């Protein structure tokens, strides 16, 4: 049923969707970077990624984060491959349900974005582009290594390493991976547009939703701010207008947008407000209820018979 969000795991439930029935998939998938419990896709965990500090202990985000058992050591070398295998466990189904020429936008962590690309290419997709969503601010902690030596009483190394830090730079951009399901050999893009009405992009969406785009800019760098109305729904919340930009970029009214990792329903709400149909999945009960309330839909109208595997 369209215009619904289902309280279930899309990895299994998406198999119930018809082949070649979806016009676009837009999803903020788990990044596999230990952001929260739902983002830890390996068994090798401990506490805060990149070491801990008193500042981190005061911040709820860093209290939640998992850490590879040995930090960023050789013990973590299997994690990228494990993440790629997890993506490949569902990307084939994404390919199946999409119409030829349809677009997929996937928000991916910088650390493992390349593994998402490989997984999707292995599933048949064409990697079209990598967009950049630029943010005004982002949570960030990079521990001063001199402080570590100072706590050890190692004055020589404290002085030697003043100004040096561990962990990453402040993450002020997020990659948005753009994939496309290729049209059939022997056809043309124009023929595919006539048949499936997907495969091109709408330049007006860039100037309408993006605060930095000029009429002829057509840049793959997107600047969409998070507003007060975007906050408080999910720890990894994306701006509603950013999702509207992506939906408006590759779909037309009355077409179907799918979000298999729907979270608090931002993609689905954007689709609804743009007069697109939507289908979403969210297995976390609490977050699912938030999405239902935002969408203003009745749960009973979106009942999915889970016995039909």
Swiss-Prot record:
Keywords: DNA-binding, Methyltransferase, Restriction system, S-adenosyl-L-methionine, Transferase
Enzyme Commission number: 2.1.1.72
Catalytic reaction list: a 2'-deoxyadenosine in DNA + S-adenosyl-L-methionine = an N(6)-methyl-2'-deoxyadenosine in DNA + S-adenosyl-L-homocysteine + H(+)
Keyword flag DNA-binding: yes
Enzyme class name: transferase
Swiss-Prot/TrEMBL GO biological process terms: DNA restriction-modification system; methylation
Pfam families named among the record's database cross-references: N6_N4_Mtase
GO terms, molecular function: DNA binding; N-methyltransferase activity; site-specific DNA-methyltransferase (adenine-specific) activity
Cross-referenced InterPro entries: DNA_methylase_N4/N6 (IPR002941), RM_Methyltransferase (IPR001091), SAM-dependent_MTases_sf (IPR029063)
Keyword Mitochondrion: no
Leader peptide range in chain numbering: none
Family (UniProt): Belongs to the N(4)/N(6)-methyltransferase family.
Protein name as it appears in the record: Type II methyltransferase M.HindIII
Gene symbol of the encoding locus: hindIIIM
